[in-house]
A protein has these predicted regions:
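Acidic, mature catalytic/reactive cores of soluble proteins
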Residues: 1-121
């Protein structure tokens, strides 16, 4: 999952009133921030929060209209991309004010996001 899309995913799910799915995504985003090493956030993670995503070709899959190759992973997980911090903060902002959520963000969540912001600074 590319974190550069975090804000847009939250916005789209909110616009569709997909509150349950949005809350699950916000929980995933929360877990990314919680597990951030010293505030460092990768540009992308696996859906199960996997950090190492080496690119490899899946030869047994033909690809779209047989036009393969199909690849899994991306070496970008090794990169430092500063824009990702803003996308995470903007995406997570919904969890602080949306009263429809079962679990809204709290002071501990704010402190974790603050560390993310400091890392970007």
């Amino acid at each position: 999952c590319w974190l550069r899309d975090a804000f847009f995913v939250v916005r789209a799910l909110n616009s569709l009133s997909e509150v349950g799915t949005m809350e699950e995504y916000l929980r995933w985003l929360h877990d990314v921030v919680r597990d951030a090493d010293g505030g460092h956030i990768q540009p992308l993670y696996g859906i199960g929060l996997e950090k190492a995503l080496p690119e490899r070709e899946l030869a047994h899959l033909r690809g779209y209209r047989g036009m393969g190759p199909v690849r899994f992973g991306n070496q970008a997980h090794e990169h430092l991309q500063h824009d990702v911090y803003g996308h995470v903060v903007l995406g997570a902002a919904q969890s602080f004010h949306d009263r429809r959520l079962f679990r809204r963000a709290d002071a501990d969540d704010y402190a974790r996001l603050e560390a993310v912001g400091e890392r970007a600074w």
